[in-house]
Every structure is written in C-alpha cells, then in structure tokens.
C-alpha cells in the first residue's frame, strides 16, 4: 500500500500558495485494509475514507468510464491493481494531475510541471470531454489563477467549445452549476469565469440572461466601455475589490452585481443607447435566473432589489424626503441594515465599473446612511405611549421619520453637493 498527496495541494505548494485542503490517494489497497487501520469510510459510490487523526480524505486509486450522459454517468473501478498513473489520468487538468509521495518526490505523468511553468490550463486527455462540468471548472481555475498569468491551452478551449455546442451542458443540474458558479464568485477574478464561459459558448446555454447583454450599447458619455456585458464584468471586478475585506455576503453582492443591469437586454432598439425603465425590467430576468438555479430567497430578494433600486440610490441627492422614506421602507432598512450596506456596495461598484471611473467617490452612500441614522432616532414606543393605535402608529411613525429626514437632508445636502 502506497500513499500519495494529490491534486490541488501539490499544485498550490509548487505555486508557493497557501495549501488549504490536502487530498490523498491510496494505491494497492482495499477498503478492508483502510478500515482495519481505523479509517472511516464516507464514500458510497467509491471508497473515500477519513484519516483517524487528521480527518483528511484518503481515496482508493480508481479509474472512471463514461456510461451515460451528464457528469454522473460514470462506472468506477477501484481495485488494488489500479496504478497511480491510471488514477491521475482521470483528472481534469495537467496541473491537477500531480502527486507527491511521503518522501517528497513529485510524480508527473502528464506534463503538469511544464504547464505550471508555462502558466497553462491544459486537459489531461480526451476523456476531459466526457464530463461537461469541466467546462465550468476550467473557467473557475482561470478565474483563480488569472493574476498569476494562467491562460487556457488552445486545444482545451476547443474541447470546451465542443462541449458547449454538444448539448451536454443541459444535462448538468441547476444545483451543480450554481455550486461551481458560487465558488467562482469567490475567486479573485470571477469576471474571468463569465468571460471564459462567454468565449466558449457556454454562457448562452447556462446564463442566457447575462449573455443577452453582449452588444447592448450604453451612452458613451456615461459608459466609455459602451457594451453592457463589458460594463457588467467591470462592475463585478469592482464588487470584488469592495467586498474582499468586508463582512458582507461576498457571493450575494457579487451575484447582484452581475444582475443589476439585466433589464437593459430588454430595451427597445429604437431608444438605444438609452435604457429608460431598465431597473424594473431587470427584476423578471433576475427572478428567472435565481429560480432556475434554486438560489436562496435572501440572494434572490437582494439581487431583485439591486436591479429595481440602484438608480434611485444613484440619484439620492435629487430625492424628496418622502421618496427617501419610501425607499427605506421598501428596502426594509430598519430590520436589515446590513443588507442596505451591501446594496450600497453594489451601487458603488456600478458607478466605478466604467472605463476611467474606477477611482470616483460615491458620496451617496454616506448621505443616505446619515439620513437613515436620523430616521432611526424616531422612537415608536414614544408614539404608542402618546395614544396612537393600529394603523395610526405606522402613519405617525412615517410622518416623524419624514420630518427627521427633511431636517437632516437640509443640513447636510450642501456639504455633499457643494463640497468646496
């Protein structure tokens, strides 16, 4: 029985990156061999075991043979005669098909070391095309290692295009697509994930609402990048920068960033490049997207709010106190202040996600937050103690909040609109 460290741990170690998870392959052993040494079996379809002390995963070496459609139709063989080379042959990319024995020796049967040096994401074998999920995985690795200069090998890109055109992507479950996408949203460059899917033809299959933004123009005065898909990717980049060191729900903010302008794909051609009413128009495609991938209600609600109200927030200085209160009530800022903060981050990303506007200030955030704080000082208990009942309590609460917002707005607006 021989044990090897495999996959991402070896890859990241060689890239001088922090190793987060360590996976092991066991060659020349049976399930009984590991069980007798105290390992705990957790895999059903093929034996995966947890180490009795470290709880790291140890899998018996195996081969896989395609026996159906999608990413689940595989027959596994995990007999003790399976070699390390055979096991590594089923990996997706050469840089993931590296192994290291307990003495530190590296095993590279498929050119992974060379591809690491050349910063290439290359498939191990033609069997890559048997699993459509690998299109998303490669796009995610491109998003992860973009800053290190990694690119996708041309022959691998061709296979990804073939898979995208084959209809195999439609066999992927919504949950699996979202799992890969959510992981990609948390990578350093998630925009590369979506750009890669677009380039190989997968975006149109999996995210048609987002793909529809390609070629939709914006006014050059406000959007020098013009193309709405390009703008959306720039907004996503900014959302990453704004959330990387915050407590905000990163995946929710970044997902909302890619949804915020979906309504622009529905703009009548005769009024382009203007997009009157795109905010409300974007709610339905966002809802369809969320429901198709069975996303949590909190993520869907947040994305829809970002679609419908981001322009209100951009125009905060123009809004009357009554309108601001309606906005606060619709956003439920009283019970969900953290969601309000996150929405403001999406609005900042939207403003900065334009060519040449990456460093602009966004005073609307502080302005609205101060108005929210002033309205928050209105005490509902005081209203109740003064004898108001039922609907009259709500009406009086709104009236007093409007007064508070008006007063604070009058005091601070000149400072924001005439900073000199």
Curated annotation (Swiss-Prot):
Domain of life (superkingdom): Bacteria
Further remark: A single active site specifically recognizes both ATP and CTP and is responsible for their addition.
Quaternary organization: Monomer. Can also form homodimers and oligomers.
Binding-site residues for CTP, renumbered to this chain: 8, 11, 91, 137, 140
Keywords from the named record: ATP-binding, Hydrolase, Magnesium, Metal-binding, Multifunctional enzyme, Nickel, Nucleotide-binding, Nucleotidyltransferase, RNA repair, RNA-binding, Transferase, tRNA processing
EC number of this enzyme: 2.7.7.72, 3.1.3.-, 3.1.4.-
Single biological process term from Gene Ontology: RNA repair
Pfam families: HD (PF01966), PolyA_pol (PF01743), PolyA_pol_RNAbd (PF12627)
Family: Belongs to the tRNA nucleotidyltransferase/poly(A) polymerase family. Bacterial CCA-adding enzyme type 1 subfamily.
List of residues binding Mg(2+): 21, 23
Protein's recorded name: Multifunctional CCA protein
InterPro entries: CCA_bact (IPR012006), HD/PDEase_dom (IPR003607), HD_domain (IPR006674), NT_sf (IPR043519), PolA_pol_head_dom (IPR002646), PolyA_RNA-bd (IPR032828), tRNA_CCA-adding_enzyme (IPR050124)
Underlying gene: cca
Named cofactor requirement(s): Mg(2+); Ni(2+)
The record's free-text note on cofactor binding: Magnesium is required for nucleotidyltransferase activity. Nickel for phosphatase activity.
Function: Catalyzes the addition and repair of the essential 3'-terminal CCA sequence in tRNAs without using a nucleic acid template. Adds these three nucleotides in the order of C, C, and A to the tRNA nucleotide-73, using CTP and ATP as substrates and producing inorganic pyrophosphate. tRNA 3'-terminal CCA addition is required both for tRNA processing and repair. Also involved in tRNA surveillance by mediating tandem CCA addition to generate a CCACCA at the 3' terminus of unstable tRNAs. While stable tRNAs receive only 3'-terminal CCA, unstable tRNAs are marked with CCACCA and rapidly degraded.
Keyword Mitochondrion: no
Domain notes: Comprises two domains: an N-terminal domain containing the nucleotidyltransferase activity and a C-terminal HD domain associated with both phosphodiesterase and phosphatase activities.
Stored PROSITE patterns: HD
Domain HD, chain residue ranges per copy: 228-334
Record bears the keyword Protease: no
Organism per entry: Pasteurella multocida (strain Pm70)
Binding annotation for ATP: 8, 11, 91, 137, 140
SMART domains: HDc
Catalysed conversion reaction: a tRNA precursor + 2 CTP + ATP = a tRNA with a 3' CCA end + 3 diphosphate; a tRNA with a 3' CCA end + 2 CTP + ATP = a tRNA with a 3' CCACCA end + 3 diphosphate
Gene Ontology MF term list: ATP binding; CCA tRNA nucleotidyltransferase activity; cyclic-nucleotide phosphodiesterase activity; magnesium ion binding; phosphatase activity; tRNA binding
PANTHER family in the record: MULTIFUNCTIONAL CCA PROTEIN (PTHR47545:SF1)
């Amino acid at each position: 029985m021989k044990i090897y460290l495999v996959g991402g741990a070896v890859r990241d170690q060689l890239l001088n990156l922090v190793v987060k998870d360590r996976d092991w392959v066991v060659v020349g052993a049976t399930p009984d061999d590991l069980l007798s040494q105290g390992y705990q079996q957790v895999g059903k379809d093929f034996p995966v075991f947890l180490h009795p002390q470290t709880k790291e995963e140890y899998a018996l070496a195996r081969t896989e043979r395609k026996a159906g459609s999608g990413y689940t139709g595989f027959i596994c063989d995990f007999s003790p005669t399976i070699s390390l080379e055979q096991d590594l042959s089923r990996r997706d990319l050469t840089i993931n098909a590296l192994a290291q024995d307990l003495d530190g020796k590296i095993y590279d049967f498929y050119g992974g070391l060379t591809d690491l040096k050349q910063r290439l994401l290359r498939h191990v074998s033609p069997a890559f095309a048997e699993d459509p999920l690998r299109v998303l995985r490669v796009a995610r690795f491109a998003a992860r290692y973009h800053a290190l200069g990694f690119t996708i090998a041309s022959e691998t890109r061709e296979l990804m295009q073939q898979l995208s055109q084959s209809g195999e992507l439609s066999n992927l479950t919504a949950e699996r697509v979202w799992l890969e996408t959510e992981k990609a949203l948390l990578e350093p460059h998630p925009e590369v994930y979506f750009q890669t899917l677009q380039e190989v033809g997968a975006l149109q299959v999996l995210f048609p609402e987002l793909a529809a933004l390609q070629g939709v123009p914006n006014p050059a005065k406000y959007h020098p990048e013009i193309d709405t898909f390009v703008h959306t990717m720039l907004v996503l980049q900014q959302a990453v920068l704004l959330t990387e060191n915050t407590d905000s729900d990163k995946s929710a903010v970044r997902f909302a960033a890619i949804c915020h302008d979906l309504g622009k794909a529905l703009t009548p051609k005769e009024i382009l490049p203007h997009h009157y009413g795109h905010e409300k128009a974007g709610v339905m495609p966002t809802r369809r997207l969320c429901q198709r991938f069975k996303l949590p209600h909190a993520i869907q609600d947040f994305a829809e709010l970002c679609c419908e109200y981001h322009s209100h927030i951009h125009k905060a200085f123009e809004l009357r106190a009554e309108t601001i209160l309606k906005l606060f009530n619709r956003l439920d800022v009283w019970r969900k202040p953290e969601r309000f903060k996150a929405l403001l981050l999406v609005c900042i990303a939207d403003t900065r996600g334009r060519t040449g506007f990456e460093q602009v200030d966004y005073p609307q955030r502080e302005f609205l937050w101060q108005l929210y704080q002033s309205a928050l000082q209105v005490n509902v208990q005081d209203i109740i103690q003064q004898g108001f009942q039922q609907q009259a309590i709500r009406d009086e609460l709104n009236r007093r909040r409007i007064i508070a917002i008006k007063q604070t707005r009058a005091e601070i607006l000149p400072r924001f609109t005439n900073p000199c």
